[in-house]
């Protein structure tokens, strides 16, 4: 009997050892498959990151990993079940054979416990391998391939965003467009404002005008997006009626003409001084000759219909303005020491207040090109437009405040309406600033022409129609009426009619003004240039032109008409305090603008 039990127990031990060895081999296979899966996943991810494949490869890797996870989970479940069955069998076998041989049973128990520990460790390793497989695959928005750069591009740091190349229609390029639209001839009259009003009152008016410019620019940009039109006149026509469009067309046209005249006066004065100092022929010191020469150089640039072609010139304009501020700042102390009366005014109120108010209002007038820039914007969302307008206004405040304070402390109460005229002609650094400013104002003309071209075209069509009506009224009883009817029938399809794309969405970068015929643009540019050149040869006083002409256009375009647009859409603003405070502010600036024009005109007459 003992022999039988001994042989049976030995056979049982041999079978159990075989099972244990088989289980170990299975666990080794599981671990090796897990490690192979891990290595394969790592290699896949590394290859994906190196080659920058499309986003589909990432999702395929994720699916493959998920399948591997489920497969390994099933294997782990099977191994756990086998462990339980084997443990139950081993416990039963040890209980039945304890009376036969205690030493062998103790050895079996210790072996079973050690096997269980090893199996648990192996299962933990498999689970950790699966977890590692999950963390290796990167499905976040950190890195993207070239196919995804347009939509889900990772954010770069501020250095990469600031010093990277300008993209047409981007936030930075649109900010530069707003700044170059606003900073014009009025920039040189800021120290004159400080000398007449004092430092504190001038800074207060700068902040108030900056806030008004920010609010009205946002009103125009958001209204252009909502009504899907990027021409100022068409926006007012949709909101109001055709008479509103005529008013804004006149305002934009008059504003461009007045700024064009001022720029021709300034550039001719600057260049004549430079040519005189460097002993050029007397022909180049003649203002009339210089005005004609400048107009001939400006004309070809105004024929362009895309803002992107002017990006490099506009960036150079900001550079030249910065050089001018630095040059005047470095010479402030030396010129201040030459003054006899060094009394500094902090707050001053006199008859010059209204003219200075209009100069500052004109200096922040970036609204004429607001709709046009919105049409040129790439992905014109409210957040991106708000960011661009806010940055442009902040930079204008910094420029005007620094330039006004530095120019005022250089000459105090003797500052002229054009601060550059206070410097002697022998100052080489100021001559360099004059040349840089001439280039800045030169390239601002085609930019402003792009924004006001549609208005001048529409105003020309309105004038032509009025002349046709007058013609029919005078000759309606004569035989000329029949010829006129034939003439009018040829214009049923108006060749000058403005064409604009109605299918432009919020994410479109196509402007309505880009579809016009090139010949119309050339004719209007030539006619307006000749008209401005004739006036520029006669007018010399700068501040009076800004105070009257700039005051009318700035008040009309920057205050009154945005106020009308905001009043039409006032129900879209749920907060009543914000609604009525904005209306009050716009009404106040509209009233002050027109009052300043009247007072400035009366001061000149009387």
UniProtKB/Swiss-Prot annotation:
Changing residue 258 to L: Variant under strong directional selection, linked to chloroquine resistance, might play a role in the evolution of resistance to quinoline drugs in southeast Asia, significantly reduces parasite fitness and increases resistance to chloroquine. One of its GO terms (molecular function) is L-lysine transmembrane transporter activity. GO terms for biological process: amino acid transmembrane transport; amino acid transport. It is found in: Vacuole membrane. It comes from the Eukaryota. Residues 1-156 are annotated as: Disordered. Residues 12-25, 72-89 have a biased composition (Basic and acidic residues). Keywords: Amino-acid transport, Membrane, Transmembrane, Transmembrane helix, Transport, Vacuole. It holds the Pfam family Aa_trans. The chain crosses the membrane at residues 175-194, 200-225, 246-271, 283-301, 313-332, 352-372, 393-412, 428-449, 522-539, 545-567, 579-605. Residues 140-149 have a biased composition (Acidic residues). GO terms for cellular component: membrane; vacuolar membrane. It is a multi-pass membrane protein. Changing residue 541 to N: Might play a role in the evolution of resistance to quinoline drugs in southeast Asia. InterPro entries: AA_transpt_TM. Belongs to the amino acid/polyamine transporter 2 family. Putative amino acid transporter. Probably transports tryptophan. Involved in maintaining the osmotic homeostasis of the digestive vacuole. Important for the timely development and growth of the asexual-stage parasites and male gametocyte maturation. Can transport antimalarial drugs such as chloroquine, amodiaquine, mefloquine and quinine. This is Putative amino acid transporter AAT1.
């Amino acid at each position: 009997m003992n022999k039988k039990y001994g042989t049976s127990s030995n056979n049982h031990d041999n079978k159990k050892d075989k099972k244990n060895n088989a289980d170990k081999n299975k666990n080794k296979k599981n671990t090796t498959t897990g490690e192979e899966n891990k290595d394969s996943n790592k290699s896949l991810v590394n290859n994906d990151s190196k080659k920058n494949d499309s986003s589909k490869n990432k999702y395929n890797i994720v699916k493959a990993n998920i399948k591997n996870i489920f497969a390994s989970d099933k294997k782990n479940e099977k191994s756990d079940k086998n462990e339980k069955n084997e443990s139950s069998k081993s416990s039963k076998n040890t209980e039945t054979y304890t009376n036969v041989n205690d030493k062998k049973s103790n050895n079996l128990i210790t072996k079973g416990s050690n096997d269980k520990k090893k199996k648990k460790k192996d299962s933990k390793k498999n689970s950790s391998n699966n977890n590692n497989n999950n963390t290796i695959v990167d499905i976040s928005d950190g890195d993207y391939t070239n196919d995804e750069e347009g939509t889900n591009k990772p954010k770069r740091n501020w250095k990469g965003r600031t010093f990277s190349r300008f993209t047409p229609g981007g936030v930075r390029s649109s900010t530069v467009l707003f700044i170059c639209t606003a900073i014009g001839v009025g920039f040189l009259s800021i120290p004159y404002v400080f000398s007449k009003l004092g430092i504190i009152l001038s800074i207060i008016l700068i902040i108030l005008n900056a806030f008004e410019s920010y609010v009205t620019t946002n009103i125009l940009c958001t209204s252009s997006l909502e009504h899907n039109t990027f021409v100022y006149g068409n926006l007012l026509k949709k909101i109001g009626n055709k008479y509103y469009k005529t008013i804004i067309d006149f305002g934009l046209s008059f504003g461009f003409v007045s700024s064009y005249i001022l720029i021709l006066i300034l550039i001719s004065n600057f260049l004549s001084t430079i040519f005189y100092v460097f002993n050029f022929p007397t022909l180049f010191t003649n203002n009339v000759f210089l005005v004609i020469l400048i107009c001939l150089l400006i004309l070809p640039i105004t024929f362009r219909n895309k803002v992107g072609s002017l990006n490099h010139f506009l960036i150079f304009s900001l550079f030249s303005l910065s050089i001018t501020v630095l040059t005047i700042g470095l010479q402030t102390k030396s010129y201040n020491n030459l003054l006899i009366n060094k009394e500094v005014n902090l707050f001053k109120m006199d008859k010059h207040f209204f003219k200075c108010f209009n100069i500052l209002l004109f200096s922040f007038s970036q609204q004429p090109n607001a709709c046009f820039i919105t049409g040129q914007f790439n992905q014109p969302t409210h957040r991106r437009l708000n960011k661009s307008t806010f940055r442009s206004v902040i930079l204008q405040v910094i420029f005007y405040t620094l330039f006004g304070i530095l120019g005022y402390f250089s000459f105090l109460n003797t500052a002229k309406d054009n601060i550059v005229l206070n410097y002697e002609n022998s100052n080489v650094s100021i001559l360099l600033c004059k040349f840089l400013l001439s280039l800045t104002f030169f390239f601002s003309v085609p930019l402003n022409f792009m924004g006001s071209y549609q208005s001048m075209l529409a105003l020309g069509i309105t004038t032509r129609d009025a002349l046709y009506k007058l013609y029919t009224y005078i000759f309606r009883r004569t035989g000329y009426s029949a010829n006129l009817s034939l003439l009018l029938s040829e214009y049923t399809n108006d060749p000058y009619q403005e064409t604009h794309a109605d299918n432009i969405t919020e994410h479109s970068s196509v402007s309505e003004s880009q579809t016009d015929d090139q010949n119309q643009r050339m004719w209007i540019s030539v006619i307006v240039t000749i008209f401005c050149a004739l006036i520029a040869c006669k007018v010399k006083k700068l501040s009076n032109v800004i105070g009257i002409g700039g005051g009318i256009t700035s008040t009309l375009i920057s205050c009154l008409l945005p106020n009308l647009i905001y009043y039409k859409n006032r129900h879209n603003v749920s907060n009543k305090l914000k609604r009525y405070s904005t209306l009050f502010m716009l009404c106040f600036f509209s009233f002050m603008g027109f009052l300043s024009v009247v007072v400035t005109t009366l001061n000149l007459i009387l």
